[in-house]
Amino acid sequence: MARRPLVMGNWKLNGSKAFTKELIEGLKAELHDVTGCDVAIAPPVMYLGTAEAALSGCGCSCGGKSVIQLGAQNVDINVKGAFTGDISTEMLKDFGAKYIIIGHSERRTYHKESDEFVAKKFGALKEAGLVPVLCIGESEAENEAGKTEEVCARQIDAVINALGVEAFNGAVIAYEPIWAIGTGKSATPAQAQAVHAFIRGHIAAKSQAVAEQVIIQYGGSVNDANAAELFTQPDIDGALVGGASLKAPAFAVIVKAAAAAKN
């Protein structure tokens, strides 16, 4: 089946009110006529309100609804209560966020989030009607030890074991080899495709139908120079973009490359 690609920008810990407005205005100008690719941005949660306002009334033929959708970089498993500093699914929905990143290696590493905890976040998002963007991927040491597939399978199985394979219906997986995140080193298109094919095959062992529709993004130093070649690969359904998402022209090139390759 034809899968509609998704290119998502993860701003990480970057931005300000002024930056958010300026970048979104640039993105709207660059992307207003793009079709055939879903686009989302995940600014810091403090700027979701600013982003929501900036995205409304885009002034093009879409009837006032921007082609760019909102996302977020994290969520808690609790809906409300005494959980200082946390953000709930309902709060994210209140600002129109749809695509929510979970399991990013920076969260797994710096905040000690386990596979099982990430799976709980996945379940909370599904229950709330939001789209989980599940990040998986191996470290450089694991890659060199030939454990890439083992690590990816373990991180996917945490969700399957907790929620069943059907939980991946309408969900997104982002394969981000940790050794490629923010390093300037990217997996080659062939390397990335091999892992993406493994991921899809691993899910297909439980359900072919689920595997065929799940969006599998590549992430890890994706930029305007390497995106087009990555998107020629059959199992790469878009990208989760870090640094390059902070510049409207570069991010637009990536989005347009996905739209061109997959349509």
UniProtKB/Swiss-Prot annotation:
Tell me a GO biological process for this protein.
glyceraldehyde-3-phosphate biosynthetic process
Instruction: Give, as in the UniProt entry, the pathway in which the protein acts.
Output: Carbohydrate biosynthesis; gluconeogenesis; Carbohydrate degradation; glycolysis; D-glyceraldehyde 3-phosphate from glycerone phosphate: step 1/1
Report TM segments.
Answer: none
Entry EC number(s): 5.3.1.1
- UniProt xrefs under Pfam families: TIM
The residues that the entry says bind substrate are 10-12, 182, 221, 242-243
| Any single GO CC term annotated in Swiss-Prot or TrEMBL for this entry | cytosol
Top enzyme class, one word, equals isomerase
| UniProt superkingdom | Bacteria
Keywords attached to this Swiss-Prot or TrEMBL record, sorted alphabetically, are: Cytoplasm, Gluconeogenesis, Glycolysis, Isomerase
Give this protein's Gene Ontology molecular function annotations: triose-phosphate isomerase activity
Which reactions is this enzyme annotated as catalysing? D-glyceraldehyde 3-phosphate = dihydroxyacetone phosphate
Annotated compartments: Cytoplasm
Q: Where is the active site?
A: 104, 176
Say which family it is in. Answer: Belongs to the triosephosphate isomerase family.
What is the annotated quaternary arrangement, including any partners?
A: Homodimer.
Q: What is the role of the protein in this entry?
A: Involved in the gluconeogenesis. Catalyzes stereospecifically the conversion of dihydroxyacetone phosphate (DHAP) to D-glyceraldehyde-3-phosphate (G3P).
Q: What is this protein called?
A: Triosephosphate isomerase
Q: Which organism is it from?
A: Haemophilus influenzae (strain ATCC 51907 / DSM 11121 / KW20 / Rd)
Q: Tell me the gene name.
A: tpiA
